[in-house]
């Protein structure tokens, strides 16, 4: 197979129908037709995601053999984070995390304070036996910014925020006391209050856990020496882990995050009391318990959104297609070649292959 770039098309209107018309014209100029398409893929994390889904549907309606396949060049993690951000509280978490990272890393002096605080805490933890030594361990002394490109790592940002939580709190405390102006001090104080809230810490741990499950898969899909069979196995494992987390993981997750609350004296609400949504008026709010809100509206809801996205990107058909394609891999003298897979592959394109 040889890939060729055939052009860039300017579109004044980005509706699905307009995009479809633009593609039709581009293909027509090159003597090609949508009827000959055998696959399609898009950037699922962009702000055009809805339009691309509509475009995909239009093309499949005209040509059901133009199967959708996840674009491996685009990082799956960014797509899953984009999906999570459709949930208001997940979006608030990422927004607040970005603000904290920007404020704490706004100057070399603040970065130095953060580094010194974290190094001191690492030494203290090593002495107490709370953490152990080892190559590559305990080396994080700076916060990572979550990039908007495919190379960005939201998982690294969330993980470091948890690892360095105490040091970040210390830096914000310093800014509250010694900020150069009232605006800086006020901003740091607001971030500090938000950071030490139950809602933030709960959402931080939840998203770190969920993104952590999909992180290995996201990285595997981008490797140049991609092993499709291994990648599809990771997709299956990833779905299973998320489903297990949803079905049986609430108690262990809440116990884990409760330990973190205790360490930083963060008040845990009574889960049987009525949830108070500070973002909406009491007239519009439904009377639900804290347990229902955090378990059903956050824990279950965000996991379900991730599972739905994975199922949409890697459904039974395109997963089987990718596994069939893997048998054509020339590596190791076509070690993966499988005649039965090749026959199965041909069945997806009956117009191109005669009956066997």
What are these regions (language model features)?
Residues 1-356:
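Alpha-helical structural modules in large enzymes and assemblies
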């Amino acid at each position: 197979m040889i890939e060729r770039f055939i052009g860039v098309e300017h579109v004044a209107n980005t509706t699905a129908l307009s995009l479809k018309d633009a593609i039709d014209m581009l293909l027509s100029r090159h003597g090609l037709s949508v009827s000959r398409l055998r696959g399609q893929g898009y950037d699922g994390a962009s702000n055009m995601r809805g339009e691309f889904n509509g475009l995909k549907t239009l093309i499949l309606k005209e040509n059901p053999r133009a199967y959708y396949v996840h674009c491996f060049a685009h990082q799956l993690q960014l797509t899953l984070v984009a999906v999570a951000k459709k949930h208001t509280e997940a979006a608030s978490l990422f927004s607040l995390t970005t603000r904290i990272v920007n404020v704490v890393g706004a100057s070399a002096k603040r970065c130095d304070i953060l580094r010194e605080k974290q190094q001191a805490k690492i030494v203290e933890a090593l002495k107490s036996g709370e953490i152990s030594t080892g190559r590559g361990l305990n080396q994080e002394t700076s916060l990572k910014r979550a990039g908007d490109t495919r190379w960005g790592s939201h998982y690294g940002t969330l993980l470091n925020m948890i690892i360095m939580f105490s040091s970040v709190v210390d830096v914000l405390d310093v800014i509250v006391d010694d900020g150069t102006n009232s605006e800086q001090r006020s901003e740091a104080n607001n971030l500090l209050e938000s950071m030490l809230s139950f809602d933030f810490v709960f959402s931080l741990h939840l998203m770190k856990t969920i993104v952590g499950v999909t992180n290995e898969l996201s990285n595997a899909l981008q490797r140049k020496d991609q092993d499709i069979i291994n990648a599809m196995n990771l997709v299956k494992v990833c779905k299973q882990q998320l489903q297990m987390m949803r079905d049986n993981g609430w108690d262990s997750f809440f116990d884990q995050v409760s330990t973190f609350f205790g360490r930083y004296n963060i008040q845990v609400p009574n889960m049987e009391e009525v949830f108070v949504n500070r973002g909406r008026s009491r007239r519009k709010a439904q009377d639900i318990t804290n347990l229902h809100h955090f378990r059903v509206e956050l824990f279950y809801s965000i996991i379900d959104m991730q599972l739905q996205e994975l199922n949409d990107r890697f459904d039974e058909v395109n997963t089987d297609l990718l596994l069939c394609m893997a048998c054509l891999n020339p590596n190791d003298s076509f070690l993966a070649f499988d005649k039965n897979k090749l026959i199965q592959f041909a069945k997806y394109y009956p117009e191109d292959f005669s009956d066997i």
